[in-house]
């Protein structure tokens, strides 16, 4: 593909890294995937990469560092590993897109604040619940100040691996913080539920926002619908279950009108099953961020020429 693309690599050959590989091969013309690196030589992800003609290595970060032309690295390993990776990638001048809870860079939600961080050396994608719900809280807060936002993400138990289960506390804290610093809520709260139902359910989210003052429901509804359309550009399975609901509630801050939104996310089925919308929205968001970063790097290259 030559000078018209940015060379990228994926760190982590598990479910997330493998699904992201399929997404990168399936879409943006701005990126060229040149390496999938893991640490398990027998992993299915590395075998699939080789079968698809993508260079694969079990040497982890060392394999990435051996390629001086790789400019963007997607890290789908673990928070502990990313702490080390972030330092090495920064020192070698590469942009890191972090899919772990490490948060060594600013939180990014593509339709909300991505453009503010185009030159950041490291960005973090928060959590699956954050990627699904923060856009909707922001859609409310850009119309009227939000005093409190609460989200409940329910995901299929089968889609939650050991990493998710070990990091439940981190999920709730990080997502709640994202509701505040990106979503615009004065106070945020997040809850995750692992549903063991068979057959597995799609990812479902309930978003509850309590505006500070009186507001125009039509403006809030229009803002939410516009935001859903934006997210659907890169997550086609992202959809409202019902129109937003507006009703009066007794709250710690007095009787106020509240906004409730019910949302589900169906995965694209590239590698992960379609019920794993919670994982799919992370890889889809990563692809979106990578595409925008790559186009930004290409535009700077053109200016330099």
From Swiss-Prot:
Residues reported in the UniProt entry to bind NAD(+): 13-16, 159-167, 278
GO molecular function annotation: acetaldehyde dehydrogenase (acetylating) activity; NAD binding
Top-rank taxon, per record: Bacteria
Transmembrane spans: none
Enzyme Commission number, as recorded: 1.2.1.10
Matches recorded under Pfam families: AcetDehyd-dimer, Semialdhyde_dh
Residues at the active site: 128 (acyl-thioester intermediate)
Gene Ontology biological process terms in this record: catabolic process
InterPro entries: Acetaldehyde_dehydrogenase (IPR003361), Acetylaldehyde_DH_C (IPR015426), NAD(P)-bd_dom_sf (IPR036291), Semialdehyde_DH_NAD-bd (IPR000534)
Keywords assigned by UniProt, alphabetized: Aromatic hydrocarbons catabolism, NAD, Oxidoreductase
Reaction equations catalysed: acetaldehyde + NAD(+) + CoA = acetyl-CoA + NADH + H(+)
SMART domains in the cross-refs: Semialdhyde_dh (SM00859)
NCBIfam families reported for this sequence: ac_ald_DH_ac, PRK08300.1
Family the UniProt entry places it in: Belongs to the acetaldehyde dehydrogenase family.
Protein name (database record): Acetaldehyde dehydrogenase
Organism: Roseiflexus castenholzii (strain DSM 13941 / HLO8)
């Amino acid at each position: 593909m030559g000078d018209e693309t940015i060379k990228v690599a994926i760190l982590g050959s598990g479910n997330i890294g493998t699904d992201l590989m399929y997404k990168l091969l399936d879409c943006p013309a701005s990126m060229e995937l040149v390496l999938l690196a893991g640490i398990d030589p027998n992993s299915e992800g590395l075998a699939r990469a080789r079968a698809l003609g993508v260079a694969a290595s079990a040497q982890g970060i060392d394999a990435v560092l051996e390629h001086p032309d790789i400019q963007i690295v997607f890290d789908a390993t673990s928070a502990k590993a990313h702490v080390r990776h972030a330092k090495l990638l920064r020192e070698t001048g590469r942009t890191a897109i972090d899919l772990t809870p490490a948060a060594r860079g600013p939180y990014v939600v593509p339709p909300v604040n991505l453009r503010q961080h185009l030159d950041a050396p490291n960005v973090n994608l928060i959590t699956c619940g954050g990627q699904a719900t923060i856009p909707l809280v922001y859609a409310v807060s850009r119309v009227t100040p939000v005093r409190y936002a609460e989200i409940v993400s329910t995901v299929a138990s089968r889609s939650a691996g050991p990493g998710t289960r070990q990091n439940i506390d981190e999920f709730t804290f990080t997502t709640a913080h994202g509701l505040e610093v990106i979503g615009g809520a004065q106070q945020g709260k997040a809850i995750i539920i692992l549903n063991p139902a068979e057959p597995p359910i799609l990812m479902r989210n309930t978003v509850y926002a309590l505006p500070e003052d009186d507001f125009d429901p039509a403006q809030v509804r229009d803002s939410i619908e516009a935001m859903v359309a934006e997210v659907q550009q890169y997550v086609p399975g992202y959809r409202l279950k019902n129109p937003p609901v507006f009703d009066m509630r007794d709250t710690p801050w007095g009787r106020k009108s509240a906004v409730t939104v019910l949302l589900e996310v169906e995965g694209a089925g590239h590698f992960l099953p379609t019920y794993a919308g919670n994982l799919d929205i992370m890889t889809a968001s990563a692809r979106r961020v990578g595409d925008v970063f790559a186009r930004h790097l290409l535009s700077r290259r053109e200016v330099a020429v």
